[in-house]
Amino acid sequence: MIRRVLPHGLGRGLLTRRPGTRRGGFSLDWDGKVSEIKKKIKSILPGTPCDVLPDTSHLPPEHSDVVVVGGGVLGLSVAYWLKQLENRRGGMRVLVVERDHTYSQASTGLSVGGICQQFSLPENIQLSLFSASFLRNINEYLAVTNAPPLDLQFNPSGYLLLASEKDAAAMESNVKVQKQEGAKVCLMSPDQLRNKFPWINTEGVALASYGMENEGWFDPWCLLHGLRQKLMSMGVFFCQGEVTRFVTSSQRMMTTDDEMVTLKSIHEVHVKMDHSLEYQPVECAIVINAAGAWSAQIAALAGIGKGPPGTLQGTKLPVEPRKRYVYVWHCPQGPGLETPLVADTSGAYFRREGLGSNYLGGRSPAEEEEPDPANLEVDHDFFQEKVWPHLALRVPAFETLKVQTAWAGYYDYNTFDQNGVVGPHPLVVNMYFATGFSGHGLQQAPGVGRAVAEMILEGSFQTIDLSPFLFNRFYLGEKTQENNIM
């Protein structure tokens, strides 16, 4: 059930409400929607290879209790947990809309697939710890009758983060928080670094932190396929198309400062079909904005950020596409099979790729050097000028590396504080966010999906309190800053 409320912690004199009271009323006729659902027998789909994605070009249903905008792992995870947790409540119709059915520009497929617990915020650490458990037990969560077990090709390997003298104190503080949250992390001095990793040049390194458990990398395509396969077996609908419009109703309410605000509710989603001028209207009760780098555009369709500047109604979702390059190189004299994922003091990073003396890595550009995100073309000069010099300094063997290939992908970059946006919008009361993770959305998707589903079904976060990631922080100017973003 969904309760009529104003959102948690609006501040600045607005009527406040806690997520735990979000149920019923205000055009969100949950009981009515659920009562319309007719039980259908879904045939169990056999498994297919991880790189084969099913056709989803058919029309969406005319009504769906929940419409998930975005079919990457974050959107799929929300859909999975909605179906998994609502077993106690009866049937729920869920539709996932994805405009790029090949996932050629999706952040999921272009990710390097890493998972790490070495964050500065307890919430991010908790999310990644849960994700590690989810991935380790993937076939308990995503098993499908008559389908072969999933193999995520997980490579257990710690993350090795290097800190300069000016960042050493912050690293010590971060590791203390990580240990308090249950992460297995240790600090290493330069001498300890040289003993364990003799191929590292420790010049400029004052301290390092090293993950000893639940870190590594995996195949994001197999996770994507496994989620889609499981969701289809659970009766979730998929549609290839683009969301172009929301039909809403509104209601005016007074704040405690005698200021009028407009509450909106989305009743209908218009989906433009691929290669067509036609659109299909889908009646709905809930919309999940998991559109990744383009989630701000979806939010704007609902009027978010269209009000006067400085007001809650005028507060935009601060998420935009940022292009990031990944380079793959060959170096027979490189560090070898025991190479962790290394994050250098310069911001450059690298890890082993496979067993053939190949490595991959990159570096986030400086703010003033951000590349044009209009396309996914690779800037090879960026590697030569901004990445390779740091790699060769840290690992002298990399002076002779040869670049083999490269690609570019998108971060759903939160320009406000580089952290995720999770939960309901305070004024568009039935739009929920799962976006803005700025590069760590893939690894935290299982926990984020569960949190959003809990908020919808229970009215509050149940397992991990992600209240610091609510939308209202943008209006209040209260940053939830994560310091460890690569």
Curated annotation (Swiss-Prot):
Q: Which SUPFAM superfamilies match?
A: FAD/NAD(P)-binding domain (SSF51905)
Which EC class, in a word? Answer: oxidoreductase
Q: Which GO terms describe its biological process?
A: mitochondrial respiratory chain complex I assembly
Task: Specify the protein's topology with respect to the membrane.
Answer: Single-pass membrane protein
Where is it localised? Mitochondrion inner membrane
Database matches in InterPro entries: FAD-dep_OxRdtase (IPR006076), FAD/NAD-bd_sf (IPR036188)
- Tell me yes or no: is Transmembrane among this UniProt entry's keywords: yes
Q: Which residues form the signal peptide?
A: none
Protein name (Swiss-Prot/TrEMBL): FAD-dependent oxidoreductase domain-containing protein 1
Q: Which organism is it from?
A: Macaca fascicularis
Provide the gene name from the record.
FOXRED1
